[in-house]
């Protein structure tokens, strides 16, 4: 998600490979094709097969400076998490504390997550920033109840013993003033952002904010502010 510690999977199993026909025009690249894995293999493509299709382009949820994004359905979360829990990141040794936080977040997602996720990388307003902003937006079914659930969960979460230092990150409201009225939360360390973005190396620190029917997750506070400020100013890609 744009951080120094981030990585991507260096390889993928053959069952995840796909054969695509591609068509181009001035506005888009269109791909259609087939995968060669059988339906019973645990691949991302098979996990997606169980989801309800998404229609349309989510440009109204993307800042105008977006240079990479993806959007996919999560109407069947069980199949998504069944796939992600078997990836390389899951083979790492995480503490019982982090595993417990993951379980809590899975319960939260199953209760309140909507049916689609959109994530993007986009440019900061500050040209001196070395890294882009990164955000994941998860539609939620009941924003008020979901935020209350999150607050109660955070209140009940014990402090992590021997936790690494929290990276210094600021919401930078001076640069992004229209984000100030939306409360940001720093979450206990967990791997949910890793699971839902495919990034396998992370400091596991995640920041969250509820915004107009969505739960925003980011690896730093400034990304949340930058995203909300762009949405509030209608500085978006649209269709």
Q: Where are the predicted features?
A:
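Single conserved position on a long alpha-helix in the C-terminal lobe of the eukaryotic protein kinase
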Residues: 1, 110-239
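N-terminal start-of-chain detector that recognizes signal peptides
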Residues: 2-7, 39-45, 90-93, 105-110, ...
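Helix-biased "structured C-terminal domain" signature
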Residues: 57, 65, 95-97, 171, ...
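Glycine-rich loops and low-complexity Gly/Arg-rich segments
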Residues: 56-60, 93-98, 160-164
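Edge strands and adjacent loops of beta-rich recognition modules
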Residues: 95-119
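Generic amphipathic alpha-helical segments used as scaffolds and interaction surfaces in large
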Residues: 53, 57, 68, 96, ...
